[in-house]
Regions:
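Short, mixed-charge amphipathic alpha-helical segments
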Residues: 118-160
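Poly-acidic low-complexity segments
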Residues: 101-105, 154, 190
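Short, contiguous, well-structured surface segments enriched in hydrophobic/aromatic residues
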Residues: 74-116
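Short, charged low-complexity intrinsically disordered segments located at boundaries
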Residues: 42-48, 108-116, 147-152, 171-175
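Short, flexible active-site loops
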Residues: 62, 66-69, 99, 121-128
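Hydrophobic/aromatic-lined pockets within catalytic cores
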Residues: 82-85, 89, 93, 97, ...
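Extended intrinsically disordered or low-complexity regions, especially N/C-terminal cytosolic tails and loops
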Residues: 1-75, 83, 131-137, 141, ...
Length: 215
């Protein structure tokens, strides 16, 4: 149910963005028609100011609002999957009276500890969870870049860049910037990325049910 709420929320907000951009484009077109019909009526200074204002509105929506929203959705969805995996592992531990739980395992992240628990305690074959497990693991890297590096990868972070680049196709782009040093910004240019994430979360837990690991 929570995932459906995420899906509905994403559609609602994305539709609002699309509507706002369409309205600004119509406004720009209508103004330009008036100017073309009566060019002497409008001073160049006024025209430039008007164009700048409309362009700024579009940039604000497309670059600032849309990017912030999609990055926020990605981090929230990963937090959901991480929390849910922890819950199902803890539930499995209690139901099957396992001698060790997540807190007894070592890992670089809660996601890694969950993987260890699933393979050792629930005898889950991670290969059977593909392609969803690898997808979520790649999403973890995207989320970490958003949260810890403000969606930025520096040019000398070759391994990180290559990992994010290999997962990016059809989901986001790495926009190169060059000031004092080369770096890349993650630009989430595909609104369908959010739905794709949700489908992979659902697919993962559907496969986990075969091992009696339930939500």
């Amino acid at each position: 149910m929570e995932l459906q709420t995420f899906r509905n929320y994403a559609k609602f907000v994305e539709d609002h963005f699309d509507s706002s951009l369409t309205n600004h484009e119509k406004e720009y077109t209508e103004i330009m028609k008036k100017i073309e019909a009566e060019p002497k009526k409008y001073a160049d200074e006024y025209l430039n100011r008007l164009q700048d204002t409309l362009v700024e509105k579009v940039i604000e929506i497309d670059r600032d609002f849309v990017q912030s929203f999609r990055a926020s959705m990605i981090t929230q969805l990963f937090s959901l999957i991480e929390r849910t995996i922890q819950d199902v592992c803890n539930s499995y531990c209690l139901m099957h009276n396992k001698e060790f739980g997540l807190d007894d395992l070592r890992g670089n992240s809660e996601f890694e500890k969950a993987k260890l628990f699933l393979t050792r305690a629930a005898k889950v074959d991670i290969k059977e969870l593909e392609p969803h497990w690898s997808y979520i693991n790649n999403l973890r890297r995207v989320r970490n870049c958003i949260v810890h590096n403000n969606s930025t990868v520096f040019g000398d972070e070759i391994r990180k860049y290559n990992t994010l680049k290999s997962f990016s196709k059809g989901r986001y782009i790495l926009l190169e910037k060059d000031r004092d040093i080369v770096y890349y910004n993650l630009i989430f240019d595909n609104k369908n990325f959010i739905n794709e994430i949700i489908e992979n979360i659902l697919g993962l837990f559907e496969k986990l049910e075969k091992y009696n690991v339930y939500l």
